[in-house]
Amino acid sequence: MKKYNKLRIEWDCRRGMLELDKIIMPFYLTHFHELTDDKKDIFIRLLASTDLQLFSWFFNLAKSQDVELQMMVEYIQKVQKIIIN
């Protein structure tokens, strides 16, 4: 089991858009500990994306070209019960 810098991850979860703060931080606080190490690594990579990228992915305006990131976005949408038509 890998060790993760929880303070760094929590800091990276803080975004410049309130909409993203309402999605990403609650997911981190509630579900991050349940993820496998591989999925935790993908989540951390997701946090390196820009706010505009994340907004477009979470609100289904675009899809990430990175399959793993897109799968993580869809997983977060599912567990956070985000319904965007």
From Swiss-Prot:
Entry's localization field: Cytoplasm
GO CC terms of this entry: cytoplasm
Keyword set includes Protein transport: no
Keywords carried by this UniProt record: Chaperone, Cytoplasm
InterPro entries documented for this protein: SDH (IPR005631), SDH_sf (IPR036714), SdhE_FAD_assembly_factor (IPR050531)
GO biological process, any: succinate metabolic process
Source taxon at top rank: Bacteria
Entries under Gene3D superfamilies matching the protein: Flavinator of succinate dehydrogenase (1.10.150.250)
KW Disulfide bond (keyword) present: no
Assigned protein family: Belongs to the SdhE FAD assembly factor family.
Function: An FAD assembly protein, which accelerates covalent attachment of the cofactor into other proteins. Plays an essential role in the assembly of succinate dehydrogenase (SDH, respiratory complex II), an enzyme complex that is a component of both the tricarboxylic acid cycle and the electron transport chain, and which couples the oxidation of succinate to fumarate with the reduction of ubiquinone (coenzyme Q) to ubiquinol. Required for flavinylation (covalent attachment of FAD) of the flavoprotein subunit SdhA of SDH and other flavinylated proteins as well.
Protein name: FAD assembly factor SdhE
Lineage of the organism: Bacteria, Pseudomonadati, Pseudomonadota, Gammaproteobacteria, Pasteurellales
